[in-house]
Amino acid sequence: MLLLWLRALCRRFQHVPRRVPSRQVSRGSKASRAGWGETSKSSVKWKQLEHKGPCFAPAYEPLPDGVRFFYDGKPVRLSLAAEEVATFYGKMLHLECTTKEVFRRNFFSDWQKEMTAEERKLITHLDKCDFSEIHRHFMERAEARRTLPREQKQKLKEEAEKLQQEFGYCILDGHREKIGNFKTEPPGLFRGRGDHPKMGMLKRRVMPEDVVINCSRDSKIPEPPAGHQWKEVRSDNTVMWLAAWVENIQNSFKYIILNPSSKPKGEMDWQKYEVARRLKGVVDKIRAQYQADWKSPEMKKRQLAVALYFIDKLALRTGNEKEEGETADTVGCCSLRVEHVRLHTPADGQEHVVELDFLGKDSIRYKNHVTVEKLVFQNLQHFMEDKDPRDDLFDALTTSSLNKHLQDLMEGLTAKVFRTYNASITLQEQLRVLTRAEDSLTCKVLAYNRANRAVAVLCNHQRAIPKTFEESMQTLQKKIETKKAQVAEAQVELQKAETDLRMRGDSKSKSFLQKQQRLLKLEEQLARLCTKATDKEENKQVALGTAKLNYLDPRISIAWCKRFGVPVEKIYNKTQRERFAWAFNQAGEDFEF
């Protein structure tokens, strides 16, 4: 297992950043240290970096005596380690994931590892475990927190602010910058996204001995909690993270980094979108080249061209190389297998349709029927000939060779740049088509969400339908029906007032105008409710936020807001506005991506 882990680290970070001599190396070998960090072509990113280190999750608080765990109908007093893991499961009893066999199996396996020998001998079947008292205890605690008096809520708020002031800021080159995630993630059960094969596994508590601290040589080294020491303290000014560790579920790196609203992060965002804008100038040439390569006599060149077509047209990720069984069976473009692709042979003038069905990033299922060019279809037929379902579709291609090809096409070009470019262009074009100047504010916001939805569909940003969706839709529908009745009543009152006016031969009275204004107001309210219901229904399975935060140039949205008189608060919440503060001055109403 150790060998597999080390090999995975080497592949994950193909280039080892320039080592800066660390002041303290307390644990870990050179091999384990080599993978820490994100690499960058630019060398020095800061001269001074000082911070307090991460804020660790509080120690486990044992259950009160009146809250018991039962096995086979009998109360069992668990050891502290086993009890803590039991509470993780008990808290989640109301969630659907605890009914899934994979979740239950993984949880029970990891839970038994935390038990004493006596507990393992006694507790052998999850079905005989009763966590109901534990679940009720935590539900009551949550309800008590919700109903706290205002004074106590204010006290908790002040304590959180004090913690923020202590751990939530750093000094970067003389400037006080906000840190994004200064707290380590508390221990619990891994849920993952989609049907992740590791759901239910135990996320272990992050300890100071797991953490690498990064700060400047002349700054004060953060103090670890009493009785502990850091894994390592280093001074690497070629990276922007403040602290890092490896989480135990997927052996992936976790970082404490600056808040997205900080100046350095804003500059990185700007650079990301500027690279995508540069692609706009060469994308036609790139497309012409890969279309020409569909006819190449070289198999590798044809596979490269079809893969690039998928990345461009379908916004697929490249797909990272990994050990067999190392993690979930998730794939990207380069790791597609024959079993992931079905070709629907055209007949009677029908289009060439390819069906793709695989687990993408975070085990989110990608299922799509897409019409492709005839040459792409024919190449796919050839790539799949004489292959078994588990064979690679692009067997002459690797992730590294594809990435190198992208760099040869344009400096800085990656699959993510293609996704960013196509997402931003799609948003801009959809907004142009869907927005009408004469529309109401509500309709304009709906148009924006529909444009955003087109991007989310392109990027396969899905979400599970919220459990409360049906209930909230029923509530909304009742409001609509009530509002319709009020509109109908107001219409009758207005007609009656109009008849009275005609009979008296009067000009419009104050009472008539008030009834007219009331009807208009009610009709506006009804329109807003109907639009909200439409928006809610259309986006019930689509995650709009991912693209908005990571792939859409904010200047497009800000320019659209300015052009059509839409308050930017309708598009971005406060946190998002802070994150994209850099874009507000750059985006006039005539900005074009």
Swiss-Prot record:
GO terms for molecular function: DNA binding; DNA topoisomerase type I (single strand cut, ATP-independent) activity. The gene is Top1mt. Residues 261-593 form the Topo IB-type catalytic domain. Pfam families: Topo_C_assoc, Topoisom_I, Topoisom_I_N. One of its GO terms (cellular component) is chromosome. Keywords: DNA-binding, Isomerase, Mitochondrion, Topoisomerase, Transit peptide. Its main location: mitochondrion. The active site is at Y551 (o-(3'-phospho-dna)-tyrosine intermediate). The lineage of its organism: Eukaryota, Metazoa, Chordata, Craniata, Vertebrata. This is DNA topoisomerase I, mitochondrial. It catalyses: ATP-independent breakage of single-stranded DNA, followed by passage and rejoining. GO terms for biological process: DNA replication; DNA topological change. Divalent metal ions (calcium or magnesium). CDD domains: Topo_IB_C, Topoisomer_IB_N_htopoI_like.
